């Protein structure tokens, strides 16, 4: 086992904390044969193992090129991490956008991924200037991430043929806990499409968010509803109404300068017109949203959210909502300075974990794991 760079059992910058907080660098640029590590995803398995996924980019920071899908495991809530494990390496091609989801009935970890030729970039695929496209893949582990099945192509049932670019997550999927779709596995994704001609001009490239889902414990996957245009990377969370309502939280290219949110009351088949909560400021970046707990008759249920709360990719911030995402009255800075993508998890002892991109001079120097009690967050009220 490998002990990562332990920054501290210490306090985070900002305010005095109630308890020691752990920060640990899990992936560091330039180490392990990779130029840089990006796109973190973090999930807890049925036997309480932590899985930290990311992309290992061999030669540059580019989203295109030789990119492998990597994993580290921890069995002690993030104190010690395994050596990196290569989940998928397809030579010079791009294997990425990890989005794991745990089936709580079977214990299987399903890992949704995307693939494209390493010499073909996002702009080319969006513009339709290449015969290549972005495809959707699925792997799984029945042993809590120790080994993985070879990825299989599920593009035919999860992507509209008219779409160009496609991304699973990044982040995590969920399993619906209540209502008529209880047990459904839901994975948030995004896609690009070419809009119709406008006044004789060439078609414009637009973006949308959507979900894919499985009702048979991951054996088959189907395409769910979409939200478009001007939507992008997204994450999904179940609301506390007891009927399985879903909230889709989306990066977007509007001028709102904040996140977009849309609701579904039919398991992700259809979505409402999005609204734009002004509290969730963002620089057009990925974000994470997660349920911390369910209503217990005494206290309201809580949601967690993390992203760079800035007009630029800066100041990774964690927020808390007690009204299913309508308002976010509690917030605290987890990392001051450059920061980008992140992924939240709730650990077995109910402490909160966050795996996030950060650095001193740019946001992509390392992927860091942080762990803290919810009291650390709520003391900022």
Residue ranges and their predicted role:
Residues 7-18:
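Hydrophobic h-region of N-terminal signal peptides that target proteins for export
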Residues 1-7:
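Bacterial N-terminal signal peptides that target proteins for export
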Residues 17-381:
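Asp-box/BNR beta-propeller blade signature and adjacent active/binding-site loops
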């Amino acid at each position: 086992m490998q002990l990562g760079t332990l920054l501290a059992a210490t306090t985070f910058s900002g305010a005095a904390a109630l308890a020691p907080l752990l920060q640990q660098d899990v992936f560091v640029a330039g180490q392990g044969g990779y130029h840089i590590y990006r796109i973190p995803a973090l999930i807890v398995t049925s036997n309480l193992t932590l899985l930290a996924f990311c992309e290992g980019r061999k030669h540059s920071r580019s989203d295109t090129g030789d990119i492998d899908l990597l994993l580290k495991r921890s069995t002690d809530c993030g104190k010690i991490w395994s050596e990196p494990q290569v989940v998928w390496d397809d030579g010079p091609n791009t294997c990425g956008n990890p989005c794991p989801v745990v089936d709580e009935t079977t214990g299987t970890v399903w890992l949704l991924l995307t693939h494209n030729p390493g010499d073909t970039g996002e702009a080319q695929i969006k513009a339709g200037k290449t015969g290549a496209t972005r495809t959707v893949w699925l792997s799984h582990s029945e042993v809590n991430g120790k080994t993985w099945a070879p990825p299989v192509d599920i593009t035919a049932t999860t992507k509209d043929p008219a779409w160009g670019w496609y991304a699973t997550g990044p982040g995590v999927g969920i399993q619906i806990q209540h209502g008529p779709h209880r047990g459904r596995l839901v994975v948030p994704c995004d896609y690009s499409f070419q809009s119709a001609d406008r006044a004789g001009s060439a078609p414009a490239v637009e973006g949308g968010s959507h979900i894919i889902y499985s009702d048979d414990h991951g054996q088959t996957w189907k395409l769910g509803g979409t939200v478009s245009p001007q939507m992008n990377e997204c994450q999904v969370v179940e609301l506390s109404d007891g009927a399985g309502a879903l909230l889709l939280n989306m990066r977007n290219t509007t001028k709102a300068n904040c996140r977009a949110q849309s609701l579904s009351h039919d398991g992700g088949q259809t979505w409402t017109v999005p609204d734009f909560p002004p509290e969730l400021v963002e620089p057009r970046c990925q974000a994470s949203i997660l349920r911390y707990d369910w209503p217990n008759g005494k206290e309201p249920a809580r949601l967690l959210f993390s992203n760079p709360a800035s007009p630029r990719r800066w100041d990774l911030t964690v927020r808390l909502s007690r009204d299913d995402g309508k308002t976010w009255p509690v917030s605290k800075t987890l990392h001051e300075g450059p920061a980008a993508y992140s992924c939240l998890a709730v650990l077995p002892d109910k402490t909160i974990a966050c795996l996030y991109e950060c650095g001193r001079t740019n946001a992509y120097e390392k992927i860091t794991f942080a762990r803290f009690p919810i009291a650390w967050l709520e003391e900022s009220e």
